[in-house]
Swiss-Prot record:
Gene3D superfamilies: Glycogen Phosphorylase B. Keywords: Glycosyltransferase, Transferase. Its EC number is 2.4.-.-. This is Uncharacterized glycosyltransferase MJ1607. PANTHER family: SULFOQUINOVOSYL TRANSFERASE SQD2 (PTHR45947:SF3). It comes from Methanocaldococcus jannaschii (strain ATCC 43067 / DSM 2661 / JAL-1 / JCM 10045 / NBRC 100440). One of its GO terms (molecular function) is glycosyltransferase activity.
Length: 390
């Protein structure tokens, strides 16, 4: 099968989890014997590369200060690129998130191209409502992507329910296919000495427990509530919170640390990926995912593969990945006391920690490999192709 995958981010250009998802899926499809062309953005990167068997084509849309206007320019350039490559050679086009749906919808109508849309989150879920004209416009485009596409893929059952409710999408049009990872990439060998030296290099002392947060510094990710939990955590444990991520809330969060008197116990690393991220997971004593809204939560899988216990908010897709006190811990969202309890539960009981870590690693290897997810995705492609008479 020849697949065109359209996404606004793809490694090494990483904005969030979407880039990692698209890379994992594209390479999984290639390993399953399919040919994949990725159409993405990359101003300072080559216009074409073959990365692990995936053909990556990059466009360079005109810059614009207004993100929605820029997204329109981007979609136009992506459509042009597909025209140059030859649209007719593809069996299906797979678009990711709202800003690429114009490409899929136009090619469906003009070329009768089977069009599959992946929705990784919704504007209402990300922002807690529609509070600006831009949000309303994005919401409208999300709706159009569900209406125009032949099939919709969501990354969790909870997101499917959200999509069907918000956009009135027929349930049989929406297929749930979980995110995945390559577990062996995060299950690295790190000696005790290497771990200690790495922790020292990022400001964690030998006698401190390391609490890790990985993600964007946004309201959606709930990092504020983890910081607010730190005074209570420090009552029972000598710990340091390491924050790996960037975002608009950085200044606010640093001010909050000073207000709570915990600035000396919090390290802001900024955006981290690659080997450094893998070492962070392996070196941490616990990974906390305090999200307010989380359609899936790929960070949980990465931590589970690394053999580090996870404490997660009981929201969205996280509740589908994590079973409370079996392969991780649930805590209440937006509740610092509950987060502190969850962290203490893991740090205070070594036997329990080992129990959930072993279960988590077993789950991630058995249920969340990209090769299996690619096979499920191909089944959705086939449905879309049948609908368009291919």
């Amino acid at each position: 099968m020849k697949i065109a995958m359209v996404t606004w981010e793809y490694p090494p250009r990483i904005v969030g989890g979407l880039a990692i998802h698209c890379k994992g899926l594209a390479e999984g499809l290639v390993r399953n014997g399919h040919e994949v062309d990725v159409i993405t953005v990359g101003y300072d990167l080559p216009e074409y590369e073959n990365i692990n068997g995936v053909n990556v084509y990059r466009v360079r849309p005109i810059s614009h200060p207004h993100f929605l206007t820029w997204a329109m320019f981007m979609a136009e350039e992506m459509e042009k690129k597909l025209g140059i490559l030859g649209v007719d050679k593809y069996d299906v086009i797979h678009c990711h998130d709202w800003m690429t749906h114009f490409v899929g919808a136009n090619l469906k109508h003009i070329c009768r191209m089977p069009y599959v849309q992946s929705i990784h989150s919704t504007e209402i879920g990300r922002c807690g409502g529609l509070y600006s004209d831009d949000s309303k416009a994005i919401h409208a485009m999300e709706y159009l992507s569900t209406y125009e596409s032949c099939q919709v893929i969501t990354v969790s059952k909870s997101l499917k329910e959200e999509v069907c409710s918000i956009f009135n999408t027929p349930e049989d049009k929406v297929k749930v296919i979980y995110n995945g990872i390559n577990p062996w990439e995060f299950d690295i060998n790190l000696s005790w000495e290497e771990k200690i030296n790495f922790r020292r290099s990022i400001g964690v002392q030998d006698d401190e427990k390391m609490i890790l947060f990985v993600g964007r510094l946004t309201y959606q990710k709930g990092i504020e509530y983890l910081i607010r939990a730190m005074p209570k955590i420090l009552e029972r444990h000598n710990a340091k919170l390491v924050i790996a991520g960037s975002g608009d809330m950085r200044d606010y969060l640093e001010d909050l640390c000073y207000q709570l008197g915990v600035r000396h116990k919090v390290v802001f690393l900024g955006f981290v990926n690659g080997d450094t991220l893998k070492k962070l997971y392996k070196s941490a004593d616990v990974v906390v995912i305090p999200s307010v809204y989380e359609p899936f939560g790929i960070v949980a899988l990465e931590a589970m593969a690394a053999g580090t216990p996870v404490v997660v908010s009981s929201v969205g897709g996280l509740m589908e990945i994590i079973k409370h006190e079996v392969n991780g811990i649930w805590v209440y969202p937006k509740n610092p006391d509950s987060i502190a309890w969850g962290v203490d539960r893991v740090l205070s009981d070594w036997g329990f920690r080992e129990y959930i870590v072993n279960n988590a690693k077993k789950d991630v290897y058995e249920k969340y490999s990209w090769d299996n997810i690619a096979k499920e995705t191909v089944n959705v492609y086939k449905i879309a192709m049948e609908m368009m008479g291919r």
